[in-house]
Curated annotation (Swiss-Prot):
Regions annotated as coiled coil: none
Family membership noted in the UniProt record: Belongs to the tryptophan dimethylallyltransferase family.
Protein name: Prenyltransferase nscD
Biological process terms in GO annotation: alkaloid metabolic process
Pathway involvement of the protein, from the record: Secondary metabolite biosynthesis
Lineage: Eukaryota, Fungi, Dikarya, Ascomycota, Pezizomycotina
Function: Prenyltransferase; part of the gene cluster that mediates the biosynthesis of neosartoricin B, a prenylated anthracenone that probably exhibits T-cell antiproliferative activity, suggestive of a physiological role as an immunosuppressive agent. The non-reducing polyketide synthase nscA probably synthesizes and cyclizes the decaketide backbone. The hydrolase nscB then mediates the product release through hydrolysis followed by spontaneous decarboxylation. The prenyltransferase nscD catalyzes the addition of the dimethylallyl group to the aromatic C5.
MF-aspect GO terms: prenyltransferase activity
Length: 436
């Protein structure tokens, strides 16, 4: 991990911090600086976002690691993650748009992992409230209205212990040509019965409470009908995860996350097109199929009606493949937007091979500005030999269709715990160079 000059300049004039915050700043602050530098952010925007990260994100990451085992295993980053409470995303740009950088955190506080806060929601709500007072564009009206509908009514002690875990996450998007930080909140129902009631009871009532009794629910109702009556849509399973934009109510989107275990490309295409109701050109479907097969390590000649080959873990057990999607619900739209997620953490393809495949796709189709800058970021976070031989940096690639091209985002992990010993050597070396 090599330092970026602007990170050094900002660090030089920061006030003293405690040991935990110093650690997280030296690791994740440098990651953020590298991403913005490679993405071509203006220098003033880099400084602005680094200061936001230092004072509004770092204090929420909790105690610094003391071993390669997390004291609290966060759900940020999905199955690829090592329990670290932060991960990143890089939304590849287009010919006329620079990449967009985001981070996702599960805020950790004094009550995290204690009986006083079994759902780890206190620190998150405090952080969101702080954002609403310091970021002019943040509006929590929709979130405060939705959140009570997702909070479980748990009474029995045994249920509390069984269902304890993360219930909220926060995302922060830092666009290069803006002076705002866009905030998103993600809610996770802990009780299974809540998930089954999401489309029929919880979301309709939450949307009426937020937007008024006469709110148009066409888009939400379409998702429910698609998942109950369509031959392809009925194979989808709700995860319960729901994302919501923390902005003015009229601009707020609600994202509903689902999964499928059908891995045939014909099925993937049917979900992306909503059973043909949202057409996608054959050219774009062909691009998506080629990328899907390459990232999943499937042979190019595999028929589109066939399931992906089942992967076998080192211990001989089978590695089930699931495909996540989200539906983007907006009251003013009759149909939802759709985004697919390609999980590369369980793919036989190495992290470096997956990243190279995406960069190749972007270069072949003239998408993105200097997509190889993304490779520079990955190689700075993790040595090339680890990217070639190990898994864990890359979590997902998401793919949507925007303006007749594939809109691709990479989600990846800092590996703070997995690379704990390497970070210790790096930081101790830094400390010696400062005090010698």
């Amino acid at each position: 991990m090599t330092s970026v000059p602007i990170f050094e300049s900002v660090s030089r004039f920061l006030p003293p911090a405690n040991e935990d915050e110093q650690y997280w700043w030296k690791i994740t602050g440098q990651h953020m600086a590298r991403m913005m530098h490679e993405a071509g952010y203006p220098e003033d925007r880099q400084v602005e976002c680094l200061l936001f990260h230092r004072f509004k994100v770092i204090p929420c990451l909790g105690p610094r690691p003391r071993s390669d085992t997390p004291w609290y295993k966060s759900r940020v980053g999905g199955g690829a993650a090592d329990g670290c409470p932060i991960n990143y995303s890089w939304r590849f740009g287009t010919a006329d748009r620079k990449p967009h950088i985001r981070n996702f955190i599960e805020p950790l506080g004094a009550l995290t992992n204690t009986p006083a806060d079994p759902l780890n929601e206190v620190a998150t709500k405090a952080l969101l409230q702080d954002y609403s007072m310091t970021l002019p564009n943040v509006d929590l009206e929709a979130f405060w209205t939705f959140a009570p509908h997702y909070r479980p009514r748990i009474i029995e002690k045994a249920d509390i212990e069984k269902l304890a875990g993360a219930s909220l996450l926060v995302g922060a998007e830092m666009s290069p040509d803006s002076h705002t930080i866009d905030i998103k909140a993600y809610m996770y129902p802990r009780v299974p019965s809540q998930t089954s009631q999401l489309l029929t009871t919880i979301l309709p009532q939450a949307m009426r409470d937020a937007y008024g009794e006469n709110v148009c629910l066409d888009s939400l109702n379409f998702v429910h009908e698609f998942m109950t009556k369509d031959p392809q849509g009925s194979q989808l399973v709700l995860t319960g995860t729901t994302g919501i934009d923390c902005c003015k109510l009229q601009d707020t989107r609600v994202k509903i996350y689902v999964i499928t275990r059908n891995t045939s490309f014909d099925h993937i295409a049917a979900i992306m097109t909503l059973g043909g109701r949202r057409p996608i050109s054959e050219e774009l479907l062909g691009q998506l199929k080629a990328l899907w097969y390459e990232l999943k390590g499937a042979p190019a000649e595999l028929p589109s009606s066939e399931q992906l080959p089942v992967q076998t873990k080192p211990d001989g057990s089978k590695n089930p493949i699931v495909v996540p999607f989200y539906f983007d619900i907006q009251p003013r739209l009759a149909l939802p937007d759709v985004k697919a997620y390609i999980d590369v953490s369980t793919s036989p393809v190495s992290d470096l091979a997956a990243a190279n495949a995406v960069v190749r796709h972007l270069e072949q189709h003239g998408s993105g500005q200097n997509p190889k800058a993304y490779l520079n970021v990955l190689k700075d976070i993790t040595p090339v030999e680890e990217l070639e031989t190990q898994k864990g940096v890359l979590a997902f690639y998401s793919v949507a269709v925007k303006k007749n091209e594939l809109d691709i985002t990479s989600y990846f992990n800092p590996q703070v715990y997995k690379r704990y010993f390497a970070h210790e050597v790096h930081l101790n070396g830094q400390r010696r160079s400062v005090f010698e």
